[in-house]
């Protein structure tokens, strides 16, 4: 498994824990990785994301199959069912069926409640190098690989101009948000994909803002508060089913407040 050799080697050469939580961003290959682990351990890969329920868990306890049961938290949340399924998942990781292994998949630890997380061995995917990502798709501007930081994101990536425009939008916000009124600030929603599929995702926007503010902070420490604020909002954006429009608007208003004072 290119880019995850150390983690892969550790998992295929030792006994698998009964309950596992894999943390890796979109496009890092969690499903393919787990399938390969299952093949090496001669376990049937069974994705129960769509079917997880108390009734299913009860059925698994009387099954004699030797399986790896997989639950994708992000996929489950997109159907607004994660909260209703937490108790079933908790029961499964607390007492996994005999001869079976549980794999919970998520993008960030914050997406998994503590009672589930605390009962799993947590495995984190390593970051991919820019050199490796360049082999998948070449961009002349290395900054783009900070935004598209997994193979899957790079494969889905569009033309370079799209990202150059995003850098320009973020630069303009940083330089001008202090003199914008509330109406001007909220008008920036037009760049996002809340109502426009061609717009930028909230994750991509925050990733870009954090990167650019960090670069500015290295040259001018007055940007530290803006960088810290952005880091906080990056974490908030990882919450499942968050109201992205509300989060985006609040971020810009708080950012304006920081630069108003400086």
Segments from the language model and where they lie:
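Short beta->alpha connector loops
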Residues: 49-53, 106-109
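Conserved catalytic segments around the Walker B and adjacent sensor/switch elements
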Residues: 41-50
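Conserved alpha-helical scaffold flanking the Walker A/P-loop in AAA+ ATPase domains
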Residues: 9-13, 51-93
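Charged, glycine-rich active-site and insertion segments that engage polyanionic ligands
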Residues: 1-42, 98-101, 107-262
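Structural motif
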Residues: 71-72, 103-105
């Amino acid at each position: 498994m290119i880019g995850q050799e150390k983690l892969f080697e550790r998992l295929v050469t030792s006994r698998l824990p009964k309950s596992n939580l894999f943390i890796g961003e979109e496009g890092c290959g969690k499903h393919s990785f787990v399938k390969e682990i299952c093949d090496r351990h001669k376990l049937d890969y069974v994705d129960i994301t769509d079917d997880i329920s108390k009734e299913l868990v009860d059925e698994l306890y009387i099954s004699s199959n030797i399986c790896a049961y997989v639950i994708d938290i992000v996929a489950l949340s997109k159907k607004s069912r994660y909260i209703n399924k937490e108790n079933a998942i908790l029961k499964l990781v607390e007492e996994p069926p005999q001869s079976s292994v549980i794999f919970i998949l998520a993008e960030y630890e914050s997406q998994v409640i503590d009672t589930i997380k605390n009962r799993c061995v947590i495995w984190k995917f390593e970051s991919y190098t820019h050199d490796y990502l360049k082999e998948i798709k070449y961009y002349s501007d290395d900054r783009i690989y900070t935004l598209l930081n997994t193979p899957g994101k790079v494969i889905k990536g569009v033309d370079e101009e799209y990202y150059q425009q995003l850098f320009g939008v973020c630069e303009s916000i940083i330089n001008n948000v202090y003199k914008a009124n509330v109406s001007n600030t909220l008008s920036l929603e037009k760049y996002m994909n809340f109502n426009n599929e061609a717009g930028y995702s909230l994750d991509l926007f925050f990733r870009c803002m954090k990167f650019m503010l960090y670069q500015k902070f290295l040259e001018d420490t007055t940007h530290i508060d803006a960088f810290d604020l952005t880091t906080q909002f990056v974490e908030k954006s990882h919450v499942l089913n968050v109201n992205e429009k509300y989060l985006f608007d609040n971020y810009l208003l708080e950012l304006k407040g920081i630069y108003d004072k400086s």
